[in-house]
């Protein structure tokens, strides 16, 4: 699943995920309020010619107002492919796996 699919899945079923990490995806159709309780870490590349970074930046700003835990990493010069293949670093994966889904 790509980054846009992660945004859609996380917003449709926020109660299923302890945290999400959409990479090089477009959240344009997502309501930020649906992710208010879901930690989000997203990665975008400035050289990505498929996904525009501006909507992601704007969405993450809205989400940060609702959610205390949001991270946007912008990788300088990374293409769409490089963003999709290089984003899964130990640091980022540890961030994901250190979250525990609430039973609430």
Regions found by a protein language model. Give the residues of each.
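Primarily recognizes the serine-hydrolase "nucleophile elbow" in alpha/beta-hydrolase
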Residues: 1-37
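C-terminal catalytic histidine-bearing segment of alpha/beta-hydrolase fold enzymes
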Residues: 39-43, 49, 53-104
């Amino acid at each position: 699943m790509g980054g846009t699919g992660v945004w859609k899945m996380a917003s449709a079923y926020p109660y299923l995920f302890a945290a999400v990490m959409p990479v090089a995806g477009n959240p344009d159709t997502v309501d930020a309020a649906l992710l208010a309780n879901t930690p989000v870490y997203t990665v975008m590349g400035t050289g990505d010619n498929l996904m525009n970074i501006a909507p992601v930046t704007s969405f993450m700003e809205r989400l940060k107002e609702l959610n205390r835990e949001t991270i946007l990493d912008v990788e300088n010069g990374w293409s769409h492919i490089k963003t999709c293949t290089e984003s899964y670093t130990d640091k980022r994966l540890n961030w994901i796996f250190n979250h525990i889904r609430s039973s609430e």
